[in-house]
Amino acid sequence: MANFDLTRINCQFLDRHLTFPLLEFLCGKEIYNQQELLEYILETVNKTNMIDYTMDTRKRLNLSQEMPEELVQRKAEVLATLKQLQNEVAPIMKATDILKNGESMKDSKTFVNALQKDYNFKVEHLESAYKLAKYLYECGNYQESTSYLYFCLIVMSPNDKNYLNVLWGKLAAEILTLNWNTALEDLTRLRDYIDSANFSTIQALQQRTWLIHWSVLVFFNHPKGRDLIIEMFLYKPLYLNAIQTMCPHIMRYLATAVVINRTRRNALKDLIKVIQQESYTYRDPITEFLECLYVNFDFEGARLKLHECQTVILNDFFIVACLNEFVEDARLMIFETFCRIHQCITISMLADKLNMKPNEAECWIVNLIRNARLNAKIDSKLGHVVMGTQPLSPYQQLVEKIDSLSMRSEHLAGLIERKSKQKQNQESADSWKYY
């Protein structure tokens, strides 16, 4: 299934350190040649200051059991540079400890005033803290790096030349330390900054494309992520446009989120529209499963695609943890759609569509009706399933209307903004005629 593997594409939009978990995940699969994969990891890790990881990778390649002289020298240089940077930051070390432990210092002005008064804080100290945070990150010490990055966020002005780099670095470090709550906060902060910054159209598109890829790591690991990924990718026109323009392969993760999120079935209609629009640029078993089921009503095709989906998900680092849930919810979708069309069907026919034995299918349907509160009945004597109507709840109708209005409002706001910019540019161009 190498033809459906997105690791190579995804890594183009990730920080070097964020690619290591993906590459290590692939080492446990049989998609690519292990030797070539390890050689690529070694090539990549050599561009960082993670000397121990470099040595470990060399051992896995059977290159050497002892550290080469070149690495010994590099390690000494890394430690020396680290010590030098720590000495430069020493005057504010106590301040970062206070910030780490005290919630009262989270107000930026209060904290900066305290720094200047108690620690003789100077601008060069901020530059040193930034350099140390970046160096610690390059060494793979992500936890300690987050402390200095947080310090920089509190003290720095949003207009500082390094502020955007700090936002990206903080998000990456929190992802790599698996601090998903903080990572979500950093993701929101970074998104707000990108959306309000005075970037050119191309720059904004590039920034959003990178953020989309990084956010997938957060969304599939945070309890609220399944709702948030739908809201951001499907109902925020700027991000949907970035996906359609730069990275249509992200449709895989949006589609997965909708399938495993039973409370957001109202998003299916909008998702299917986007999948159909982008089908000429990107297709995979997950998007094709939804097309088979909701566009073509091809249940045999959906059954075959569901089988392919399992292989795709099993080999995708981002969504592998969702495998069982995806299969269960995909079967539910097949069941609901098939019963809605046919109303009365035999259990044996349904078992065939779900890739199950008749007795397993009956058991599964009974549990489904009981747990999901579906309006359906089973006639065990005749071996029939009779599906009743399942009205959309007022809450679901309200959510659907709000999402639709929100999307239209953002689209209109974007249109007005573009027209305003065009008018300003035209006025600016006309003004040159008088000189």
Swiss-Prot record:
Keyword Cytoplasm in annotation: yes
Quaternary state and interactors: Component of the eukaryotic translation initiation factor 3 (eIF-3) complex. The eIF-3 complex interacts with pix. Interacts with mxt.
UniProt record similarity statement: Belongs to the eIF-3 subunit E family.
GO molecular function: translation initiation factor activity
Annotated keywords: Cytoplasm, Initiation factor, Protein biosynthesis
Domain PCI stretches: 219-392
One record GO biological process: formation of cytoplasmic translation initiation complex
Function description: Component of the eukaryotic translation initiation factor 3 (eIF-3) complex, which is involved in protein synthesis of a specialized repertoire of mRNAs and, together with other initiation factors, stimulates binding of mRNA and methionyl-tRNAi to the 40S ribosome. The eIF-3 complex specifically targets and initiates translation of a subset of mRNAs involved in cell proliferation.
Localization terms from the record: Cytoplasm
Species of provenance: Drosophila erecta
Name of the protein: Eukaryotic translation initiation factor 3 subunit E
GO cellular component, as recorded: eukaryotic 43S preinitiation complex; eukaryotic 48S preinitiation complex; eukaryotic translation initiation factor 3 complex, eIF3e; intracellular membrane-bounded organelle
Xref: CDD domains: eIF3E
UniProt cross-references to InterPro entries, sorted A to Z: eIF3e, eIF3e_N, PCI_dom, WH_DNA-bd_sf
Cytoplasm is among the record's keywords: yes
